[in-house]
Amino acid sequence: MTKTSRPLYISYAGPSLLEMPLLNKGSAFTPQERVEFNLIGLLPQNVETIEEQVTRVYSQYKQCASDLDKHIYLRSIQDNNETLFFRLLDSHLDEMLPIIYTPTVGQACQEFSKIYRTHRGLFISYPERDRIDDILRSATKDRIKIIVVTDSERILGLGDQGIGGMGIPIGKLSLYTACGGISPAYTLPIVLDVGTNNRELLDDPMYMGWRHERVSGKEYEDFIALFIDAVQRRWPDVLLQFEDFAQSNAMPLLEKYRDELCCFNDDIQGTASVAVGTLLAACKAKNETLGQQKVVFVGAGSAGCGIAEHIIAAMRIEGLSESEARKRIFMVDRFGLLTESMDNLLDFQKRLAQKTADVSGWTAGSEAFPQLLDVVTHAGATVMIGVSGQRGLFTEQVIRELHKHCAKPLVMPLSNPTSKVEATPEEILRWTDGNALVATGSPFAPVEINGRTVHIAQCNNSYIFPGIGLGVVACKASRITDRMLMAASNALAECSPMVTGKGDAVLPPLKEIQQVSRKIALAVAREAQAEGLALETTEEALLEAIERNFWLPGYRAYRRRSV
């Protein structure tokens, strides 16, 4: 699978070489390399191919008793031999994606201090805020191109996990490599340890993070600024991905820094891009336009509102005015439909609130604001998207009412992990007589209904962010814009089996994700060039750059370099 046979010249030898995950080959070191690098006697006699190694570790993986055990085992391989880890993933991505990322990574974050084995990435704690430059210089990799950073305050649907949130950057960067071909040598996971308000963690004698309540307000903002400044000094061209920051910080941080460096928030922008790509694919398959849809959101946090704004932007591209587009988006939170008469709406929610006069008479009961069923009924909804983190909010009554207004509604329960999903695909299909188009945030098995097998699309950000990262790295874009994200959404939609005629799933199978990432990368890079955010080149040069930056897991020959 390697694209080059050029040898790699390295200065490490003996046990030190075996302890470097990026360079270790384990039993695959050749006889010549074992002599040249002082490895004789440190490894079993037999020299194995990487395929033979994959067979062994997969056999060991299958012996693990639980999904968490499998996660721990895969991480141990990653910490020992990164090339073997990614070759194993490449061979079994469908099976292992739910183990290295959602839903299993959620439990791994909760148990982080209990299952901790060895260091990976950087832990930057608030008490060490005056040493951030030194900490970044301590990174074992120099040529960092992508950083995923979290402060762990909103890990999936699990809330504040303290330093346990490190599992998310590690998992996300594993997907950058497995799905988007970004070399693991160019990636760095970081957790910002600003304390935790999770009392269970503070009281846990095994908790490894800073035992202090979360820093907030100006102290928090100043700490983030110190971190951003230090990153820009160390790696001025890096792509910085914000991950699992709380709603109150996620949008303000994105708005503050998106024009200062190449950054994006995957929870807001990545989720929005894959959701819009899924919605565009469904519309194309039904020969409808996005502007014909009425979209109801259950959950009005930063992720839901980010998706809504991305849909509005796509509707405007189709020709709707902004006011027309906003009238087709309905945000429902725990109090009901967001309307202008609501108090305490956040700024990004106010833009999506319906005019009170437009929804007068929608309230069926004694509630102050229209509830979900009221909204679905009166809006004539055709699409319903769940980003609430609350199990069971898509009730049978609500889904059946949705089906009344649309023969083939698109239903997207996106909350993670599976225990938080608004409704299961089996429930949705049963309540719509098998007619709904379903895309979920977590993986679900195919559903048998009406004598046919329905494959469930996983509307997972892994379809989007690896391709965005690959495109940014390939063209050396200086920023990530909304138009680049829209280009990614359109590229994803064009890959849908429903659009290409290759199947009935809304999104392509995971076995095709590397090709999908390449197409998204090209679309993103083209748009970056069109906006003047990357040097203009020919399309052929872009394709060559994408392939040049697409790392494949295979061993290179080593040669000894004198120190």
From Swiss-Prot:
Co-factor: note: Divalent metal cations. Prefers magnesium or manganese.
Binding site for a divalent metal cation: E243, D244, D267
Site-annotated residues for Important for activity: D267
GO BP of this protein: malate metabolic process
Domain of life per record: Bacteria
Assembly with partners or alone: Homotetramer.
Protein family per UniProt: Belongs to the malic enzymes family.
Protein name: NAD-dependent malic enzyme
Species annotation: Pseudomonas syringae pv. syringae (strain B728a)
Gene: maeA
